[in-house]
Amino acid sequence: YATDNFYQLKKYDLFKYLFPETNQCLSDDETGLLQPFVEQAMQNTDSRVRENKPVMPAFLIATLLWRPLTIKARFNLEQGMTPYEAEQRAMTSVIKEQAQATSIPKRFVQSIREIWSLQRNFHSKRGMRPYKLLAHKRFRAAYDFLILRVNMNEIDQSLVDWLTTFQEVDEVTQRKMTQPQKKNKK
């Protein structure tokens, strides 16, 4: 459903009215990686529907608005903002601009922001951060989003592999994985 709808909206030139910034990013994408990123998110959603699993509209919206977010965040960084401030302001800006084209319910906005914010936190492998991430109510959606980002060459596969392993191992192994690496003294 999601994939077919996306293609139909593009085919009949309607997508640009619903997601103008994303449409512009798709047109300007020189890497050729954004369209497959969006398509994979749609296909994943279709798979979840077929398997009678829950679907989060916020996940799809987060995917569609990701490139506009990263462009604005990069611009904000170049203006001298801290990474956190650049990201937060970009989130607010992208959501505000998208709201001019389509209304996004507040409950979705919160979920979208959480999915985006967790992306930065996935890089922290030490201490309690991985445990807190695993317990976060948006972990699964953010983790699935992270996997999509590997295909856009934004994230190294080793990070996803580490997080996958961390979820699957016992508590003792998790503790070992989150301990600082000891340097050999000679």
Q: Can you name each region flagged by the protein language model?
A:
Residues M177-K186:
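Arginine-glycine-rich low-complexity intrinsically disordered regions
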